[in-house]
Amino acid sequence: MMNSRERMIKALNHQEPDRVPYDLAGTTVTGICKGAFLNAMKERGLSTEYDAKEVDPISQIVTPVEETLVKLKSDTRRIGARRVIDYEKIRTKEGSVWSLVDHWDCLWKLDETKDFYYNQFTHPLEQYDSITEGLKHWHVPDWADYVDRMKADIAEQAPFLGDYCGIADRNCAGLTEMSLRIRGYEKWYMDLLLDPEGAEELLEQITQHKIDYWNSLFDWIQEQGLEDKIQVMSECDDLGTQRSTLIAPDDLRRLVIPRFKRIWANNKKRMPHAKNFMHTCGSVRPILPDLIEAGLDIYNPVQFTAKDMDLKELKQEFGKDLVFWGG
């Protein structure tokens, strides 16, 4: 019988392993929402405990404790920064409502009586006439300010890599997602036409933030001699809706995909043996060839209910280039 890492390496190289690999909580996009997790564990008679350092509190995604991951036979283990730095320290509660301002200066609130996750209430650049004007007063966080806290967190994660497929995971949402969070949804879409230079500058700052994060993570992994335990490098950007891409495919090819190409090239240079993973929801078939050309190896979540996302057709057209990772 193969161990988890051997099993995953086979599958990631388009070879047949001893069984289909299974991933639970190997990334922040393949985890499980807190409410669903609690119900599922109670139903199965398993522990309802989860990692107290919640990896993605905004989406209320939790990581089951190691004992549960072992019982559920998850082949993956995550290593990476928390999505909200110092979450337990910065959140406050008034009545049934939890509030926090993250290190991107976004205000989030969750009402325990009705919400399944945090909702965003403010955007740091929404008050300005343009992104260009806003960036004179606000800038993307400098990742160097958070490296020490990341190191403390990943030092606790590293012992659980074992013989599993280690996944180096991102520290924030994707390039378009972060742009939307920072500027606000309606204004960002308008800025693509009214302030294209500002929109590109914001994307550029987020790209550099991500590269700085990845390099700091790889530095630590290599200092600890753990690089052989890492098989996947996980990024994310929801580029699709149920019916189409989020913006025109040509705009994604011009604005977003070249920047992911830079991120993935950097990551491949640092960890040549590991595979580039991307989570992107929705109907994204038109841009899959572009993502492949940019360096994508693994596509998640394969939202087959979206337009033009037939599983058989996707496998026939892209199966030689992409590993399909559900969830």
Regions found by a protein language model. Give the residues of each.
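Short coil/turn segments at secondary-structure boundaries
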Residues: 52-56, 60, 95, 138-145
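Charged, often glycine-rich, active-site loop that binds/positions anionic groups
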Residues: 37, 93-98
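Active-site loop segments of alpha/beta catalytic cores
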Residues: 1-41, 47, 101, 110-114, ...
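Aromatic-residue-lined binding/catalytic grooves and analogous aromatic/hydrophobic interfacial grooves
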Residues: 96, 102, 108
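Extended, Lys/Arg-enriched charged tracts that mediate electrostatic binding to polyanionic substrates
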Residues: 78-95, 143-150
